[in-house]
Amino acid sequence: MTGNEIRESYLKFFEKKGHKILPSASLIPLNDPSILWTAAGMVPFKPFFTGAAKPEYTRVTTCQKCIRTPDIESVGKTARHHTFFEMLGNFSFGDYFKESAIPWAWEFVTEHLRLPADKLWISIFLDDDEAFEIWNKTVGVPAGRIVRMGKDTNFWEIGVGPCGPCSEIYVDLGAERGCGSPECKVGCDCDRFLEIWNLVFIQFFKDEEGNYTPLTSKGIDTGFGLERVASVMQGVPTNFDTDLFREIMDFTAGLFGLKYGVDGRVDVALKVIADHCRAITFAVADGALPSNEGRGYVIRRLLRRAVRFGRLLGIEDPFLHEVSGAVVRQMGRVYPELVTQREHVFRVIRREEERFGETLAQGTEMLNRLIAEARQAGSAVVSGEDAFRLYDTYGFPLELTQEMAGEQGLTVDTDGFGRAMEEQRQRARSARQETDYISGRDAMFKKMREEVGETVFVGYDALEATGRVLRIVQGGKRLESAQAGEEVEFILDVTPFYAESGGQVSDRGKVTAADLEVEIHEVTKPVENLFVHRGKVVAGILKEHDTVTARVDPARRAATCRNHSATHLLHKALKEVLGGHVNQAGSLVEPERLRFDFTHYAAATPEELQKVEELVNRMVLSALPVEAFETSLAEARKMGAAALFGEKYGERVRVVKMGDFSLELCGGTHLRNTAEVGLFKLLGESSVGAGLRRIEAVTGEGALSYVKAKEEQLAEIARLVKAAPHEAVRRVEGLLQTVRDLEAENEALQARLARYQVQDLMDRLREVKGVKVLAGQAAAPDMDSLRGMVDLLRDRVGSGVIVLGSAGENRVNLVAAVTKDLVEKGLHAGKLVKELAPVVGGGGGGRPEMAQAGGKDPSRLKEALEKTYKAVESQLK
């Protein structure tokens, strides 16, 4: 079976078992700062397992795109390690449990994949008798083929939250693939027993004290690795030999005029390139961009490693963007986002390859210098520390350093490299804090929601609502009441306050009753449909169960709505002006301003920004109606609604439509008509990372204030240049031209003065041990002028040492130059100024040919210059 056939067969099998087939979530996790990547099939469903959100379906099956990067250096060298892989899975949220999950897994592998039952082994958690009974009695697996294993391998848990035992299906690949030990069995580190399916039975909740409580609503989370299963079904020794990789590897080999399977060294490089290019292509299509931190650093590191292995195969020009095309051709049918984002992906990869080419040249220069230094020291070894520095700073793999050093007859201290690598890993482990699947605060509010129920949000249609106080919290502790002066968090059963989410800040306002007044500073939503109001009691007493009136600050809400609706117009305008590749990468919507991050390869030109601003304002003047409605995710996609990369949407979504111009999935608050924006004004555009740009803007009263401030600045400039405002630009241009003319005249005078001074200074030329030495004081306004005079003197002298000094108020400049022939005899300008600078209370240094220094004591400049001759004499000894 091909990889595509296995994928399709799995999904259809579970669809017939009542599961909803859902598309893969983005590789960029939604609202989960604890992880960089979606690394398992269950990650998109974590809120359902933790109880933080309610699922649309209780049975789901997916083929999830995944990235894992802890073992990057192993990729290409082992049979199974990958950075990108596909994880098939079937999930139950409070529906079926072991009694169905186990028999279905067995049915699929034996009847649909037709794997021989006598080649299959089962592992279970040590104490999971229930799973044993189902495997043995219901399914019919002999007891001798069911292996009980410990908590370290067969119990799934991550910090506080849901957890449970797991059971795995292994395929026996034959004794010839094993370690030869008579003790070889399931769980052995050799390649004989290959795990293809992991079934996790989520049946406990682990609290902060480490206690395990049975869950009333149990869950199933399974992982069925497509690449591994394909290797078994296709009878090949490694995942790389499956059809999932071979097309990409053969294409890459063709670029180099090579063949896979002939040379082991070539094969490793082809595997690395294919694996890493799959990861890069999918990640960039999902919105990741190369950078120096976070997931962007992972992308950059993978790309550089792939390019370096290309260099080992002899290719110097950018090529990875072409390999990316092979990835799109092979997988675009299953993952249509690859096709729609193809041009964006190619441009990002090509630009990053070119940038790395420049970095690689710098690294090569450094390595050549290290090799030269090792030879001078009489060593034939490049130290492990230096090799690691090349790896860490310039992205040189150890293999490339070894190859280049080997060409020069040197070796590399690989043990030292390994120690340096491990030290960095230890530092990273120390710096990294383990993040629980669900924080203590979120767990508290999840439990609270179970006790008091959810909050009904009415803020789309009303700015005032009557509600009941369900719970009051302070510092994580429940309060029955809060007095005036206290800051607390509390939950209402009904609220008009928008909770901070989707880049939009929360509403502010007041909660009141007869004698009560609470100022609301912030509203959050730690778990789905639970609105937590944080505020200060300024009068009266806030009590549980009291009925109160919640009022949103209308002016603040209106200003926020203006900026949010303008953000949608801006997003669409950027796509119209810059191209369809533009996608939202983040935003901040607050009453005072808006900030919008988007994907683009270069700074927008002033002309492009002007077009964007004009288009947005044209849509404002068009008075487009703004509508918000709910529909299914599938229907919204059919309509062409824009969605945020990395966002995980439920089956029902809210769509915001602005005439026929803009259509986006959005849960924020908006205007009724674009005319209410009033005026849209761009403040600026800047870079926030490679391929990532940022625009800041204001609307309404904020835009009006900005324009008025600019008018006042123009009026002040006009006053200063003594012109009418409409003539100010012409007047300033005239003044600037006058300044340029005067500067040119001044430069000419300075050059003439320098030539006169050079003639006078030549009279100070002396000989020291047969070497011409000139040291003198010059009238030079700055260091650049002084260097220019030194260059003139060096040309006049031909062979010699020149030292010039200039003095200003509490300032001394020194410049020294040594001609090349004398550098070869041991004279060094840098050492010379280091000796002279302390005389004038300063310091400096530089290259053997040219150096400079500064000081603070002009009164001793003559003394320093006179010392030049003895210093040169000393260097000539």
From Swiss-Prot:
MF-aspect GO terms: alanine-tRNA ligase activity; aminoacyl-tRNA deacylase activity; ATP binding; catalytic activity, acting on a protein; transferase activity; tRNA binding; zinc ion binding
Necessary cofactors: Zn(2+)
GO BP of this protein: alanyl-tRNA aminoacylation
Cofactor note: Binds 1 zinc ion per subunit.
Main location, first listed in the record: cytoplasm
Keywords: Aminoacyl-tRNA synthetase, ATP-binding, Cytoplasm, Ligase, Metal-binding, Nucleotide-binding, Protein biosynthesis, RNA-binding, tRNA-binding, Zinc
Amino-acid positions noted as binding Zn(2+) in the UniProt annotation, renumbered to this chain: H564, H568, C666, H670
EC number: 6.1.1.7
Ligase keyword on record: yes
Reaction catalysis annotation: tRNA(Ala) + L-alanine + ATP = L-alanyl-tRNA(Ala) + AMP + diphosphate
Pfam families the UniProt entry points to: DHHA1, tRNA-synt_2c, tRNA_SAD
Gene3D superfamilies according to UniProt: 2.40.30.130, 3.10.310.40, 3.30.54.20, 6.10.250.550, Bira Bifunctional Protein, Domain 2, Threonyl-trna Synthetase, Chain A, domain 2
Subcellular location: Cytoplasm
InterPro entries per the UniProt record, alphabetical: aa-tRNA-synth_II/BPL/LPL (IPR045864), Ala-tRNA-lgiase_IIc (IPR002318), Ala-tRNA-ligase_IIc_anticod-bd (IPR018162), Ala-tRNA-synth_IIc_core (IPR018165), Ala-tRNA-synth_IIc_N (IPR018164), Ala-tRNA_ligase (IPR050058), Ala_tRNA_ligase_euk/bac (IPR023033), DHHA1_dom (IPR003156)
Any one GO CC term of the record: cytosol
Family according to the record: Belongs to the class-II aminoacyl-tRNA synthetase family.
PANTHER family with a match to the protein in the record: ALANINE--TRNA LIGASE, CYTOPLASMIC, ALANYL-TRNA SYNTHETASE
Known role: Catalyzes the attachment of alanine to tRNA(Ala) in a two-step reaction: alanine is first activated by ATP to form Ala-AMP and then transferred to the acceptor end of tRNA(Ala). Also edits incorrectly charged Ser-tRNA(Ala) and Gly-tRNA(Ala) via its editing domain.
Domain characteristics, as noted in the entry: Consists of three domains; the N-terminal catalytic domain, the editing domain and the C-terminal C-Ala domain. The editing domain removes incorrectly charged amino acids, while the C-Ala domain, along with tRNA(Ala), serves as a bridge to cooperatively bring together the editing and aminoacylation centers thus stimulating deacylation of misacylated tRNAs.
Designated name of the protein: Alanine--tRNA ligase
Annotated source species: Pelotomaculum thermopropionicum (strain DSM 13744 / JCM 10971 / SI)
Protein's gene: alaS
